[in-house]
A protein has these predicted regions:
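N-terminal substrate-binding region of glycoside hydrolase catalytic domains
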Residues: 28-132, 138, 145, 151-157, ...
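Conserved, mostly hydrophobic/aromatic
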Residues: 60, 133, 144, 176, ...
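C-terminal beta-sandwich/jelly-roll accessory domains of carbohydrate-active enzymes
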Residues: 350-355, 366-433
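Bacterial N-terminal signal peptides
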Residues: 12-22
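Active-site cleft segment of glycoside hydrolase catalytic domains centered on the general acid/base Glu
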Residues: 42-43, 75, 111-219, 223-249, ...
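Aromatic- and carboxylate-lined catalytic core of secreted/periplasmic carbohydrate-active enzymes
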Residues: 288-382
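Hydrophobic faces of well-ordered beta-strands that scaffold small-molecule active sites
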Residues: 32-36, 60-62, 98-104, 142-146, ...
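Bacterial N-terminal signal peptides that target proteins for export
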Residues: 2-14
Length: 433
C-alpha cells in the first residue's frame, strides 16, 4: 500500500556554499544502540522497539533503502516492503525516547544499475532522496549516515566490487550533507562506515579528510570488526579500542582538533565454525568494550550488530551476530549488557587509567552513586569456538588454574568475600558517594 506520494523538486546544490553551520561538535550524549533488520522480522515494529527499549538501548540503526523509496524517477513514496522501518523512524522518538540512525543506503537501478552512485545524475538523485528523507523525519530521526560500507561494496549487485575513486564518495557526502542540512539543520550527519583497524581503511579516511570531508559532516562512522584478525590483541576489547585511540590521534593531527567518532557497527559472532566465539566470551567482550567506549569522550555511541540472529545455520557467521537468539531468547551477551545498561545510560566517566602492570581502572558517577570497574588486560585471551580457533582455558595470574570465562561480577562495597574469577574478568563495585 502506498503511504505517501510526492513529486520531487530537484535540489540545486551549490558546491560553493559556506559550511559555517556544519561543524564538528563535541557535546553529543553517548548513545547505546543496536542494529536491526526490521524489514526481515516477523512481528510489527512496536514489538521490537519495546524489546530494544526494555533492554536498555536508546537508539537503533536500520537501512532506509533508496531503491524502495524512489522507484520512479523523481517520485518518492513508501511501499509495504519498508513500512516497518518507516513507521519505526516516525514513532521511536516520541513513543520510546530513542535517537535512531537512518542509513541512507545503497544504489538505485534507475541511475547506476544498483551499484555505486558514481555519476553526476546518480549523485544528484541520491541527494534528492536524502533531502526527502530528512524532511520526512525532521524532529524524529537524529542521525543520518551517508551510505553503508562504501569500501566493501555492501548492498551492491556486484559481490566483488571495486569502489569508485575516493573523490566520488566525497562528492556524494558533499551533496547529500547539503541536502540533509537544508531539510533539517539540526540533523547530525555522519559518514565513513569503514574499518580503521586496517591500513587501507585509515588511508581512505585520510584521503577523504584531505579533500575536506570534515567540512560537511558532524562525525565519522566506523565499523571496527576484528574477530577475524590474526593479531590477537585486536581480538580483545582493550586492543581494539586502543587502535581506535591511535586513529583518533591521527584525526587530530589532520584536523587540528578532536573528531567525534560513532561506532555504528561492531560485533562478534557466536557461530560454531571458524571465527566464531563462545557466548560467554562475547558477553564479556560486550561489557568491556561498551565500558571502554563510554570512557572515551570522542566516541559518541556504539551500535552493536545486531539485535537477533539472522538465520538457523550455526556455522554461518552472518547468522550468529545477535545478542538474542533467533527465537528472541537472550544470549549471555544481552543478559550481561542488561546489568550495565543503567551505568551506561545514567552515569558519566570520572576517571580512566591503566597501571603499569595492565590493570584497567574506571570510575563512573551519577552524582549519588559511584561505580568502580577493574580488570586486568589480557591481550592473549582466547574465546574461539572452532578447531582452528580453539577455545583455551583462562588462567589466573596467581595459580594458573583453569577459569571459566565470566562476563562480569557486580559487587557491593561492603561485600567481604568476593567470588574467585580470572583476573581479566571485569568487576564492578557500587558505593554511595
Amino acid at each position: 500500500m502506498l503511504l505517501r506520494q510526492r513529486k520531487a523538486t530537484l535540489i540545486k546544490v551549490a558546491l560553493t556554499v559556506m559550511f559555517s553551520t556544519i561543524s564538528i561538535q563535541n557535546s553529543y550524549a553517548f548513545e547505546m544502540g543496536i542494529n536491526t533488520h526490521l524489514r526481515w522480522y516477523p512481528e510489527e515494529q512496536d514489538h521490537y522497539l519495546e524489546l530494544i527499549n526494555n533492554y536498555g538501548f536508546n537508539s537503533f540503526r536500520d537501512d532506509y533503502l533508496w531503491a524502495l523509496i524512489e522507484q520512479q524517477k523523481g517520485v518518492y513514496q513508501t511501499i509495504s516492503k519498508i513500512n516497518r522501518v518507516d513507521t519505526s523512524f516516525l514513532i521511536s522518538k516520541e513513543n520510546y525516547g530513542m535517537n535512531p540512525i537512518a542509513v541512507l543506503a545503497y544504489g538505485n537501478d534507475l541511475y547506476d544499475k544498483g551499484g555505486y552512485a558514481s555519476n553526476d545524475e546518480a549523485i544528484a538523485a541520491y541527494a534528492n532522496y536524502a533531502y526527502w528523507t530528512a524532511k520526512r523525519f525532521k524532529g524524529k530521526v537524529k542521525y543520518y549516515e551517508i551510505w553503508n560500507e562504501w569500501m566493501s561494496g555492501t548492498g551492491t549487485h556486484n559481490k566483488s566490487p571495486t569502489p569508485p575513486p575516493v573523490q566520488i564518495y566525497f562528492k556524494l557526502i558533499q551533496q547529500a550533507s547539503i541536502a540533509i542540512k537544508r531539510a533539517n539543520p539540526d540533523a547530525i550527519v555522519i559518514a565513513g562506515s569503514f574499518n580503521p583497524l586496517v591500513s587501507y581503511g585509515q588511508k581512505w579516511s585520510n584521503d577523504l579528510i584531505k579533500l575536506g570531508m570534515l567540512n560537511y559532516i558532524d562525525g565519522i562512522s566506523i565499523h571496527p570488526y576484528s574477530f577475524k584478525s590474526t593479531d590477537k590483541s585486536l581480538n580483545t576489547p582493550d586492543g581494539n579500542i586502543e587502535k581506535i585511540d591511535e586513529y583518533q590521534a591521527e584525526l587530530k593531527r589532520l584536523a587540528g582538533k578532536e573528531v567525534p567518532i560513532y561506532i555504528t557497527e561492531i560485533g562478534v559472532p557466536t557461530s560454531t565454525g571458524k571465527f566464531g566465539y563462545s557466548e560467554d566470551y562475547v558477553a564479556q567482550y560486550i561489557v568491556k568494550y561498551t565500558l571502554l567506549a563510554k570512557s572515551r569522550g570522542y566516541i559518541k555511541g556504539v551500535w552493536w550488530y545486531d539485535l537477533s540472529d539472522d538465520g538457523d545455520n550455526s556455522k554461518n557467521i552472518e547468522h550468529r551476530f545477535g545478542l538474542l537468539n533467533k527465537n528472541e531468547s537472550k544470549k549471555p551477551a544481552m543478559e550481561s549488557y542488561g546489568k550495565i545498561a543503567d551505568l551506561i545510560k545514567n552515569y558519566t566517566i570520572k576517571n580512566y587509567n591503566v597501571t603499569s602492570d595492565g590493570k584497567v581502572n574506571l570510575i563512573f558517577s551519577n552524582g549519588k552513586r559511584e561505580a568502580r570497574v577493574t580488570w586486568k588486560r589480557n591481550y592473549n585471551q582466547e574465546g574461539g569456538n572452532s578447531t582452528m580457533n580453539k577455545i583455551m582455558p583462562l588462567m589466573t595470574s596467581d595459580n594458573q588454574s583453569p577459569q571459566k570465562i565470566t562476563a562480569l561480577v557486580i559487587e557491593d562495597a561492603a561485600q567481604k568475600n568476593p567470588p574467585s574469577v580470572s583476573a581479566d574478568t571485569p568487576i564492578i563495585t557500587f558505593s554511595n558517594q
